[in-house]
Amino acid sequence: MQEAARRASLRKEHTPTNEKFGDLSKQDSLGERASSKLTLDDELYDILYAFGETDAFINKGDKQRETDEDGNPLTRQALLERIRQKKEVIGKLRCQAWSMTRKRRTLKLAQKYLEQHESKVSRSHLYMEEMRKRARLMKRSFSNFKTYLIPWESKIKRIESHFGSVVSSYFTFLRWIVFVNIMITLIALVFVVLPETLADSVANEGRFNRTKTRKQIPANERVHADELAVVWHYDGYLRYSPLFYGYYSDDPFLGNKIKYALPLAYFMVTLTIFAYSFFAILRKMAANARMSKLSGSKAEQYIFNWKLFTGWDYTIGNSETASNTVMAVVIKLRESIADIKKDAHGKFRLLQFSLRVFANIIICAMLGFSIYCIIFAVQKSQVQDDGNLFTKNQVPSVVSTITHVFPMIFDLIGKMENYHPRTALRAHLGRVLILYTVNYITLIFALFEKMTALRDRVNSTSTSSSHRTKRQQGGWNPNMQRPPPYASRAEVRQMSDFLAANTRRFQTVSQRTTRSVTTPFTVAPQFGPFNVNNPNAVFHNGTHSTSFESQILGPKALPIFTPPPRKYPGFTPGNVGQQFGGPDFPRNQVYTKSTPLPRVRTKPPWVYTTTHPPLVQNRAMTTTMSKSAKKGNSKNLDDDILLSNETIQMSEAALRRNHDGHNNDICWETIIGQEIVKLVTMDLIFTILSILVIDLFRGLWIKYCSSWWCWDIETTFPEYGEFKVAENVLHIINNQGMIWLGLFFAPLLPAINNIKLIILMYIRGWAVMTCNVPAREIFRASRSSNFYLGILLIWLLLCTLPVGFVIASMSPSRSCGPFARYQHFYTVVTREIEKRVDQTVLSYIRHIASPGVVIPIILFLILIIYFLFSLVRGLREANTDLQAQLVHERTEEKKKIFELAGGKKNKFEKDRDKKRSNDYIPLIEQRRREPWRQYHEMEADHALASDSSEESDINEDEDDERQPLTAYPLRAIETPPETLQVTAFHPSLGSLIENREMEDEESASGDQLPMIHKSVSFQGPSHMQMRQSISTESCSQISRSAIQVATPEEIRALLRPYLEAKYGIPYQHGIKSFPIDVHTPPNNTPSRRSSKYNSFVSLYEHTRDDHKNFVASTIKETDEDPGKSDKKQTSSKDVAPDFMPWPSADEARALREKMKSKTPLMLTKTTVEEKPKGGKSSESEFRPPVPIHRKYNIQTTEEENEEEETDSAPESSKKRFRISVSPTKTIAPASASRAQHKIVSQASSSSSIPHGRQPDPNKKASLVLPPLRAPRVQFDEDDSPRQID
């Protein structure tokens, strides 16, 4: 209250005494506004007016503003408050719905006030305000500068100006994916890669020896590590890099002082990345949901308005794109019109149905073919040293080809289906999405099958600890004194199969072994490990060891030769135990005798060369002879060393072709990581190739060949390449799914993906601006942004399933990765929990984690989810119902407002009201309202007009002689002609009260009254009925009485007995609403609307008939010969009104002031009495048909007749009157003996006499009507009328 009083005082202070009328109206409006509760806009509005709106006003009111309402100078607090108000005005100015001129003027005034008064508070305060101002400017400048730091913002804006916001949404989505991958990469780098690298940089000798096999490439692989095929396979140096799983050590802790658990960190980082991805996607979807407009229901209500007024893209800055957008809007409008006109059930077409079935069969066959190709490629993929590029990379090549080629084939197949363009687009997107999903699932299953085979192979070679130690050392640890060159990791069975399948024996005529008497032993020409140069063979009398592996070592292979026969010293025959040798030698051989051979002495080495055509590759073998072991009864052999070169022929199948030889052990996690990284890389290459071939080369061909080609290739086929936003977004989603899938096996895969996405950003942007055109059918990003994010969320869920299966079910590799020490991947978490949690609590946790508790919890969560879905569905339905209710109420309120304002109803509303009113109209009333009656019913139907008992007393002979009733035109008045505004009935008592009076300004002649310039609606009989002659013996009396107010409830109470008796059911509803009426055309003909003609509710439609331009006509009875009674009389003045000039402004102002004057009305009843005449008097009578429940009898008394005689004496004392009928009162006749003819007055929408019934001005007036008057009443607080004397 104090604030309101202060504002009021400010208004008084700043209001000059010599203000003009407009300024006073402003201050009056402000005073009215101050009395109510002000909103923020009102406060700002008052502040602006309180401090003035012009510079002159500010200069003149400075002295007054420096004082408060008491005249005292303003205190510092008050001045600060005013300064705060001004700052609030400046801060909220941008949000005001004002014109720009007013905003600038207000800003200027507020700033000027602050400049003048801020220094008066205190200098320190002024400095603080200046600092705040500078800080705001810096903040704003920094916010503007940040826009330049957003990556690719200018490129995206340029694309948006040429192609619109739909195409730019793809690049915005791509940029968001890049940001997400950058965050994932930072998480992996900080918590996994960086600790491992730091630990290696300060590693001691023990850690170096433990991790050397994982982090350093072996010497045999270093030779080929820089070859293109090895690098393309992500092998060589890349395999032993932090890119893959196998690089990381399995030490429980890193560092001595700061113990960092890398296995636990690796596990938790994987979970954190998936959680962050979920959070980022859901947060983006929520932001889009908040920013989106809930225009679904609105678009359904106003289809064409939304498409027309919101279909334009204001970001377009290119003329060609603008013309394309115009055509797109036109096409959408045509499609909407076609959809509206299209029948619900289209005609069945057999050919079209057959084509659609055939197209779906082809698409399903292509999906099956893609599944077969992926499975076949995964199963047959091998890492080879030779072969073409496709055989080395079958899996990524096949998957990328299917991803890029099949969607284009789907698009071509979809054209034969002849769907609606919008339906065809959605079907194509659905098929592409199904293709990506099927390929993804197939690839996962194929990789898991391959992984299972690799794990089984690893498990078969790790049956004992000795085998595991030998496999881990692999023969290449220089710190160990062993092993010999033939140390093997292979299994005995595998080695035997390998040798049996890949070894060819020499065919010689002589014996294969030669025994010399002088030598203690015999050396076979074929023995020892394969492919070893300069062999040193040792014959042992011990157990044969068959576990070995061949290695590719040393320089180039030596040529094939056959050693010359030699003689050896004799020896005693006996058993010779073999430690090693080829499969051609049995374990124990007994030589009974020796066959002497010719001895040839040569100096070693002996080199002989022979040629074998089927040989594929040469291998050199070195054999070393050492001390022999002693076994059983075998005799000791002499120590000797034999140097010889032997060559063994190997078939093509014996060449090393699998990946087992590239590493000392099989690390299946790294192998899967390599496959996924190759998929991502191959997808980038295929994307670049598709852009070059499909977009660039096609664009060049069309540009330079369209002028001379045999058909129009620019507009028909192949056209310029379209940038398909939806397909490209699905491609990005598929690529991101691969990243999430391979994240566990390759921690730095998101970094590679960032490089790929950046390349895509630039090459796609270049292709769009150079080669592409906007697509004809647009899948709008504004409506489908959450659709894309929803697909991305589903893809993330699909990626978490296989990774979760690996973590929960698979056993890690024993020789690589951070989980090599554990039985399962999740064991690292369980062990940490066991270390840090009490056993009692741990037992409870185990019980809770048991299936007996987890399964019910899962079921309970499913029920909760179902309940929430049901709740959301119910709320959505309730929201729909509320929207429908709001729309209905809005429509009804609009209709009421238009009715109150005199608006018209449209055809639909009229028909609806007509249908509603039929439920409450009696049958006799419906017959009376038939449209043909106003044209063809020559005489009033007594059966339909009235059922009054007094009508039977009327003399029927009076109908023989009739006289037409005519009405004189109205007298001209000094008011401008204007159209009468028709208002609907409003159920209040004030609608029946007349508030205006009009002075009698009849001319001295009084013969002719010109027609008024108004369009008045009159529900009455037709012209033919108006001109029917009536009997001259009958007389017509018009009774005038004061208006009696009747509420709608009273009218319903009067109608209820009749309706219950008529229909036999209790009447429940009254008159729901009174229909409005429309004004007639300029010819002033009565309304012919059947629903309003002779309607019983028309009384309330026009409750104010004494408008300022309206004067009731006077009905005069004329003496006419009986012979002339049937003759129709017309007057030119009845057809068209006389010309009346518009009144001047002074006349209109005087008339308005005269209308505002308040004059008490006559409350006495006046009647019109017919003057006595000799003989038969001819009267004009009209009997419109009236329903039973709306008929009123108007009668007069002798006192009224006498009063009429006194009122009609002088011409100057004649006053106009209005025929007003009370809907609930019937006046009984005063004298029954007197012959009277009653006029059954009908409740019409206007009480004025229609122009069709205007009397002939040439006839003598026999009836003089009193002036139009009505009692003046006022209303109390209970809405009850009270008459004013």
UniProtKB/Swiss-Prot annotation:
Topological domain spans for side Extracellular: 203-260, 382-388, 456-667, 746-748, 810-852
Taxonomy of the source species: Eukaryota, Metazoa, Ecdysozoa, Nematoda, Chromadorea
Entry GO terms, CC: neuronal cell body; non-motile cilium; plasma membrane
Name the UniProt record assigns to this protein: Transmembrane channel-like protein 1
Free-text function comment from the UniProt entry: Pore-forming subunit of the mechanotransducer (MET) non-selective cation channel complex. The MET complex is composed of symmetric dimeric MET channels, each channel comprising two copies of pore-forming ion-conducting transmembrane TMC subunits and auxiliary proteins including the transmembrane inner ear protein/tmie, the calcium-binding protein/calm-1 and arrestin domain protein arrd-6. Sodium ions are the most permeable, whereas calcium and potassium have lower indices. Sodium-sensor ion channel that acts specifically in salt taste chemosensation.
Free-text disruption phenotype from the record: No apparent defect in nose touch avoidance but mutants show strong defects in the avoidance of NaCl concentrations above 100 mM. Responses to other soluble repellents as well as to hyperosmolarity are indistinguishable from wild-type animals.
Subcellular location, principal: membrane
Cytoplasmic side: 1-164, 293-349, 417-420, 706-724, 772-785, 887-1285
Similarity comment text for this entry: Belongs to the TMC family.
Swiss-Prot/TrEMBL GO biological process terms: detection of stimulus involved in sensory perception; monoatomic ion transmembrane transport; sensory perception of chemical stimulus
InterPro entries: TMC, TMC_dom
Glycosylation sites: 209
Keyword Chaperone among record annotations: no
Domain comment quoted from the record: Contains ten transmembrane domains with putative domains TM4-TM8 that line the channel pore. Interacts with tmie through transmembrane domains TM6 and TM8 and via a tmie palmitoylated residue.
Keyword Cell membrane: yes
Gene: tmc-1
Native source species: Caenorhabditis elegans
Keywords: Cell membrane, Disulfide bond, Glycoprotein, Ion channel, Ion transport, Membrane, Transmembrane, Transmembrane helix, Transport
